[in-house]
Amino acid sequence: MLQRDEADNNLRGIPVCRGAPWISHLLFPDDCIVFCKASVDEGHKITKILEKYEKESGQKLNKEKTSLFFSKNTIREVQEAVKDMFGAEIILQHERYLGLPPLVGRGKRKAFNRIKDQVRRKIACWKGKLLSSAGREILIKAVAQATPTYTMNCFKIPDSLCNELNSLISNFWWGQREKERKLAWISWEKMCKPKAEGGMGFKDLRAFNLALLAKQGWRLFQNPGSLIHRILKSRYFPDSNFMEA
């Protein structure tokens, strides 16, 4: 329905930057974000689409889980009018998606600190349990080192954060607690080597981060017509290609 109205010019959406394609909506497994101009007229168009969807699908819009986000330049009167139309609350920021905030500015370190806090909390819970070396290995590989994967798919995280995460994980592996120090018999670099080479096969987080970004880069290179490629090209390399950006 949204695509049809967009094709009929009933719904325009918003551009990320000058020359970028217009985006009217983004669909997630359990969520949907609709973009439009902050006006009463555009609000009416959205409500008509939603009413039609409710009628044809038999599903109802949960207004308690619906929220409105406005630009700082939107006047208060328009915000209140649209709010009354939808019967939803106005928020200053959307909830996190897979641990990552929807808006990440230049100061990325603050957004990424949540990763370290998550890993620290998980490790703190594990330290109170009697775990074998095999159990520690599974928790490190399946949970601790998997926690930052989504963020690493999108951003190059600072080397300092990689070092801090490695330190937390290394201390857990060697059984070190807050008020005691234990000797690490092997460097973490060697622990990250494959088992066939004498290591434990743990991830080198810096290399893993670069590998994930390279994979995304290859997807962009192979799919120049995709929405994400067109948006990034308009924003970062309008006069060149991805390999030259």
PLM-predicted stretches and their roles:
Residues M1-A245:
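A helix-boundary/hinge signal
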